[in-house]
Regions:
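N-terminal binding-site loop/beta-alpha segment at the start of enzyme catalytic domains
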Residues: 1-77
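A short, structured active-site edge motif that brings together acidic residues
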Residues: 75-88
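Glycine/proline-rich, positively charged
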Residues: 92-110
Length: 110
């Protein structure tokens, strides 16, 4: 696996990243255990950059990803997320304010 440093941060991320949208059932139904295994496999094979969003499966992707990451050493991965689009039950809410973005980060940590 090839890695590149992000600026001068010292963070070296893999050229390939794990896109966690499928963990939320965005494309098809997924068994939670299979999703967790996919995360383990990605990290075991050198992927250390994981992209997720609270909107993927209306928080489901974050929930499944969180279950997988609890079992992995914290220094094995970096997380990327998105802000601005929220919603449950098919309703969309758009809010790009700084206040809502900060709230979203803390919601994701729960």
């Amino acid at each position: 696996m090839n890695y590149n440093e992000i600026g001068k941060t010292g963070m070296r991320v893999s050229n390939l990243s794990f896109g966690a949208s499928s963990l939320g059932g965005v494309f098809h139904d997924i068994r939670e255990a299979e999703g967790i295994k996919a995360v383990y496999t990605a990290v075991e094979n050198g992927m250390n950059f994981i992209d997720v969003s609270p909107y993927y499966g209306h928080y489901k992707a974050e929930t499944v990803l969180g279950k997988a990451l609890k079992e992995l050493p914290r220094d094995k991965y970096y997380l990327s997320t998105k802000v601005g689009r929220y919603g449950t039950d098919g309703a969309n809410t758009w809010d790009y304010s700084g206040t809502r973005a900060t709230e979203s980060v803390y919601e994701s940590l729960d």
